[in-house]
Amino acid sequence: MTLPLTTPGFTDAEHSKRLINKTFTYVVTLLIAIFAAAIISLLIIKNNVNEISDSHDDFLLRKALDTRQESIRSHLKDYAEWGDAYKHLHQNVDMHWAWDKQNLGKSLYDNFGYEGVFVLSPEGATRYSVISGKRIPEDLERWLGQSTKDRLLSELSKKKGVPVSMLTLIDGIPAIVSAEWITTGDDSSVQPLPGRPSVMVFVDKLTAKKLLAIGHDAAIKNVRISPNEVNNQTSLTISTPNGDVHILWDSENPGQALIVYFLPLLILSVLL
């Protein structure tokens, strides 16, 4: 007895068509799954690349701000540890030497952008001030506030007069403030007097223009201040004695380049 080669109720054509449909459905489902997995993987890679890039920018920006503080301390050291400065600024301020001869004058603003230059008496009173390159009588305490000034001088005392610096807010603008005792330095021709030293203070406001320049030097785009905290990858918050500083920048977004380059290739490979 010969058994039928086909399933009862189905012709050979119907059986082949059914098999083709199953195979096609399987292949299409597999391709869709592969495509979806590839898209998800690509998005994950994009986010990871962006996160690494943004973290690197965060590191570079913090480093740039630290370097700027080191720079202002170095400049201050050159002026405060100077025998002539000790002679003309410690007990009494010699205006002719300081301002008329421009030994402590507008060049600090023109060359370094220091908006504030102050000389304080041993008691902490402001004896001399240059504001944005102009000889304007101004009290340091009015600029910084009592608590910030006290903290600065306290830190200076703990460090035995070597240059110190800190970040603060002045009228909502972040600023680096650096202070150092005025000494004779290596000048043996000037004899130090007994008693407490006078203090020299430099103030560097981080204006919008300066922040853009800092970012440009670090290859970071559009560095700026935000009045409010923003919780994203392209922001950092720095605490100061009188408030937090929120700094933002524009991400390089290198992950987007991966999407633009690989996504069309991925779609094309699926279609082909």
Q: What kind of region is each of these model predictions?
A:
Residues 93-111, 129-169, 202-239:
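Extracytoplasmic/periplasmic sensor domains and loops in membrane signaling proteins
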